[in-house]
């Protein structure tokens, strides 16, 4: 203990102040995280700091001082020290970890790759014209391994080609040509390593939520819950109307099929009996025209006319259905509005 006190006494005051400042920032914000800043230009970091100033505080400090501050705060906070690696900055916010992750992803922008840098993925130059007129640029592209020629008075790439595979170092000539072609293979920004919120540590794999899929999952879950409630006859505020309608339809069907003479099914029973009667009469008339009287003949004629009219009306109904298709587009817009509402959940 004496040795630790002796060591502490020799810490410069500016370091003590820095440790206290980190502790105060952690305690005054709901969430804090650690981000990788290795390889990011100072100007880019300053721009990100300005862009986030209304929602987050970005602080760059020495890892050793950050570690001391975390250890002094105790509880589960010291577990965040395992995310201190190479060049690390701290970020503080009162937003949720999900919102913080999304904000940091939005800071990322395409950036040119330097000579000697390792390609994070295959670098592909697409076939097509460039903005360059014929000149020395043609030879420069070819010497960089980019197949180029003159086409319609412009330098053009003759074929789509992988000019550098993932994991390979980018040659000097190729790096120069990629910048001239405005091909930026790197995505530069702050990578969140972890976020701490009220005793819980969130890693980026958990925070990378696909909002479209999440929205679809919620819709599907609601539909499944609704169907389960209806099929198991479990009444809720959302399903009681459907359950009552289903019960009414099933009871009416039972009454009709069992020929139960109740006021609620008499119309259906009479309609069913009428259909059966006309069917029998029609078959009898086909065998013997004198088998039915004039009244039945009139009924059969009316039924035949109705059937013919229905046949003529079918194409018109199909056309009307096509005219109703714009309503489906309105439903799509409604779903998009729903997704926008879900987006607000994550910022």
UniProtKB/Swiss-Prot annotation:
The keyword rRNA-binding applies. InterPro entries: Ribosomal_protein_uL10, Ribosomal_uL10, Ribosomal_uL10-like_insert, Ribosomal_uL10-like_insert_sf, Ribosomal_uL10-like_sf, Ribosomal_uL10_arc. Residues 325-338 have a biased composition (Acidic residues). One of its GO terms (molecular function) is structural constituent of ribosome. GO terms for cellular component: cytosolic large ribosomal subunit. Pfam families: Ribosomal_L10, RL10P_insert. PANTHER family: 60S ACIDIC RIBOSOMAL PROTEIN P0, LARGE RIBOSOMAL SUBUNIT PROTEIN UL10. Belongs to the universal ribosomal protein uL10 family. Part of the 50S ribosomal subunit. Forms part of the ribosomal stalk which helps the ribosome interact with GTP-bound translation factors. Forms a heptameric L10(L12)2(L12)2(L12)2 complex, where L10 forms an elongated spine to which the L12 dimers bind in a sequential fashion. Forms part of the ribosomal stalk, playing a central role in the interaction of the ribosome with GTP-bound translation factors. This is Large ribosomal subunit protein uL10. It comes from Methanosarcina mazei (strain ATCC BAA-159 / DSM 3647 / Goe1 / Go1 / JCM 11833 / OCM 88) (Methanosarcina frisia). The gene is rpl10.
């Amino acid at each position: 203990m004496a040795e630790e006190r002796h060591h502490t006494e020799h810490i410069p005051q500016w370091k003590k102040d820095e440790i206290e400042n980190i502790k105060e920032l952690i305690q005054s914000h709901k969430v804090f995280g650690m981000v990788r800043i290795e390889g990011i230009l100072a100007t880019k970091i300053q721009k990100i700091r300005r862009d986030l100033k209304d929602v987050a505080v970005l602080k760059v400090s020495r890892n050793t001082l950050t570690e001391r501050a975390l250890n002094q705060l105790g509880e589960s906070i010291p577990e965040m020290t395992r995310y201190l690696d190479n060049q690390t900055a701290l970020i503080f916010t009162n937003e949720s970890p999900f919102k913080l992750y999304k904000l940091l992803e939005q800071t990322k922008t395409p950036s040119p790759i330097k000579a000697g840098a390792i390609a994070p993925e295959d670098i592909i130059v697409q076939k097509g014209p460039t903005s360059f007129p014929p000149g020395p640029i043609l030879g420069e592209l070819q010497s960089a391994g980019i197949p180029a020629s003159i086409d319609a008075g412009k330098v053009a790439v003759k074929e789509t080609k992988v000019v550098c595979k993932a994991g390979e170092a980018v040659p000097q000539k190729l790096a120069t040509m990629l910048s001239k072609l405005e091909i930026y293979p790197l995505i530069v920004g702050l990578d969140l390593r972890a976020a701490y919120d009220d005793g819980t540590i969130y890693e980026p794999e958990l925070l990378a939520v696909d909002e479209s899929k999440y929205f679809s999952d919620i819709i599907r879950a609601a539909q499944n819950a609704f169907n389960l409630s209806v099929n198991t006859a479990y009444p809720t505020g959302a399903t009681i109307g459907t359950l009552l309608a289903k019960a009414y339809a099933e009871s009416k069907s039972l009454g009709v099929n069992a020929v139960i003479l109740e006021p609620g099914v008499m119309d259906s029973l009479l309609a069913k009996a009428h259909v059966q009667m006309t069917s029998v009469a029609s078959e009898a008339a086909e065998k013997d025209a004198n088998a039915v009287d004039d009244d039945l003949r009139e009924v059969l004629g009316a039924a035949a006319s109705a059937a013919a009219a229905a046949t003529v009306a079918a194409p018109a109904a199909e056309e009307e259905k096509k005219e109703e298709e714009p309503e489906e587009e309105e439903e799509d817009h409604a779903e998009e509005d729903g997704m926008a509402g879900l987006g607000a959940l994550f910022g």
